[in-house]
Amino acid sequence: MTPVKVFGPAQSTNVARVLLCLEEVGAEYEVVNVDFTVMEHKSPEHLKRNPFGQIPAFQDGDLYLFESRAIGKYILRKYKTREADLLREGNLREAAMVDVWTEVETHQYNSAISPIVYECIINPAMRGIPTNQKVVDESAEKLKKVLEVYEARLSQSTYLAGDFVSFADLNHFPYTFYFMGTPYASLFDSYPHVKAWWERLMARPSVKKLAAVMAPQGA
């Protein structure tokens, strides 16, 4: 079987989200780099894969997909096994909870944590743009409120959708991994159930493999 292709560097949070799903299900894949320095992401060839000129793009035979969470769901459906059932679509109640917390990650958690990662890591290191402390402070306060909700939820269940790991949990990995390299990582210390949940995620073989790829060189 021809391996699927993922277009974009593994260090990208959105690409890493896709790769994590592939690792969880044990699928063969090939990572195809997209060179941003020469604007390859805006090339006609790449725009055929992702019309918005972004990453990731995904190829499975003659099927092309974009948007990392949609790609992740496709992967988890295609390669679903009893051991790798991360969408729980055979159980209406469980699937609904996976959907709820996937939406929460997208609209609440990600919107709070990603600006901190951008301002503390991406903008200064990759773009030469100084950290905007006002954005960081506002996002940190927003993140605290989100983590309060997570703490309450995770005091009742091992993972977000229930006592089983799911797509909803995995989606949190890329940005949280980079967040833990910022001066604000200690925020998690105030939320013991959230911190324990994160440590459980970090112990997964798939997560360990991606973390090694995403870690800064020399770290």
From Swiss-Prot:
Glutathione binds at S12, H41, K42, Q54, I55, E67, S68. Conjugation of reduced glutathione to a wide number of exogenous and endogenous hydrophobic electrophiles. It comes from the Eukaryota. One of its GO terms (molecular function) is glutathione transferase activity. One of its GO terms (cellular component) is cytoplasm. It holds the Pfam family GST_N. Residues 2-83 form the GST N-terminal domain. This is Probable glutathione S-transferase GSTF1. Residues 91-219 form the GST C-terminal domain. It catalyses: RX + glutathione = an S-substituted glutathione + a halide anion + H(+).
